[in-house]
Curated annotation (Swiss-Prot):
Its EC number is 3.6.1.42. This is Guanosine-diphosphatase. GO terms for molecular function: GDP phosphatase activity; metal ion binding; ribonucleoside triphosphate phosphatase activity; UDP phosphatase activity. After transfer of sugars to endogenous macromolecular acceptors, the enzyme converts nucleoside diphosphates to nucleoside monophosphates which in turn exit the Golgi lumen in a coupled antiporter reaction, allowing entry of additional nucleotide sugar from the cytosol. It comes from Schizosaccharomyces pombe (strain 972 / ATCC 24843) (Fission yeast). The gene is gdp1.
Amino acid sequence: MTPTMKSIARRKALLIALSIFAVTFILWNGFPGSSNRPLPSSNDEFHYEDIELPSGYRSEGEVVDLLNPKDELEEPLFSEEPLFPVTTSIPTKTAVSKPKIAPTSAAKDVTFSSSIDSDDCSVAYDNSKPVRQYVLMIDAGSTGSRVHVYQFNNCNPSPKLEEEFFKMIEPGLSSFAGDPEGAAASLDPLLDYAMENVPEEYRRCSPIAVKATAGLRLTGESEAKAILKSVRQHLENDYPFPIVKDGVSILEGSMEGIYAWITINYLLGTLGGKATHSTVAVMDLGGASTQLVFEPRFASDGESLVDGDHKYVLDYNGEQYELYQHSHLGYGLKEARKLIHKFVLNNAEALKESLELLGDSTSIIHPCLHLNASLTHPDSKSEASEVVFVGPSLAHLSLQCRGIAEKALYKDKNCPVRPCSFNGVHQPKFTETFTDSPIYLISYFYDRMISLGMPSTFTIEDMKYLANSVCSGPTYWQDAFSLTDALKELKEEPEWCLDLNYMISLLSVGYEIPNNRQLHTAKKIDNKELGWCLGASLSMLSEQNNGWNCNVKEEI
């Protein structure tokens, strides 16, 4: 090797040595600008608060949400373009597994993750409760079932609803008559959805209830019991959620009204010791029944609500509410239609007037149908011919229809305890015991009026004007209703005139609400759905009436 070649080889060796030294130095002391912090071992705890964030990103003591920062930075924390080519593998969604579980320990052994805090607080008002809590309610209706997953925080004496997750499926439990196991399995999509939305460490202390409506009764008592038993066994064997006392059952109509009242007053902030406004009344119009719940206020200290099935004393968050409640079975919208049709049919047969024989059918003028409408009576008495109801040929301004609806209320029926509403049922008068607080109308009340462009606040006089417009027929609709959907609904539903006039009669004659009293209707408050489910879930969190314990189990 020549001297020149030896010199070149020595230079290469020196450069390699210097490179090795530089790499070793950097790895030992860290990159410029970084602290001399050893990497944590597998036994060290990692704390979010140890992460150094840019100045101004959070205030002292503020909980940092790394995924959803409250304030946007002037410049992104990371470059939008990767420094090096990155291949990302996106995992596909897999079904939620249902672990088989067996009880092993007491509820006191449950621990909750402190990393799952609320935006409102990091420590619960009551140390025995977690900051965040979940409640699951399955509403098993006749046509389908739906699950509500409610997320609460316990930052204050009363739980605060933070978020609601919702999913609906069809058909309902009653469609599985003769197949109880199939009925139970039909709820799996809802239960798996709940598993996805409740963090794993909270599932065993997240109570669940399955409440079927009266539609399940139509399958027969033994069939309904078999379905409910199978649903309960499925929950106990395949899911971690604790079941509340009487948690898998048919919901009584009276409790539907109570829970709906709790829901609306909770969302309006009129419940609890810090409430600054009086509670509101709630009227719920379903298909088979209608419920009324309100808190009467008597002028004299010596007066109070008389004892009876209508009286319900509610304990909520240390406050006691003495409520009037009643569920009028058979006076829901669909049942009221049948009742009014029966009145019209019987009246026509008795008088033999307005009867026209049209081949194999009998035509009867029906004052509760809009102008020139026709409707085949679904319960025609004669097997030889069907009954066709037809609307009047001249506008009648709804008065005749309301007269029939008022007769269906049996206002003059004997009433043992006065004052009374209708059909012999006791009820304190609104004009004496509930003079100025709001009245909320929900369910079919909302559906029938809002879809026609009615504002959310109105009077019975406004309802009468709307009913007159609807009953006047298609020629008048073009000028009265500008909404395309409203016109479509009116054309497809000949009983809309009947529905509105029945509602007017129910409110003004049945419940005796003054025509100029302001009424409110809504489907949601603060983007939370109205109805009985939220109220029932709040009841499940009540210390006095919870009827459940944490379901502390382990996988086997």
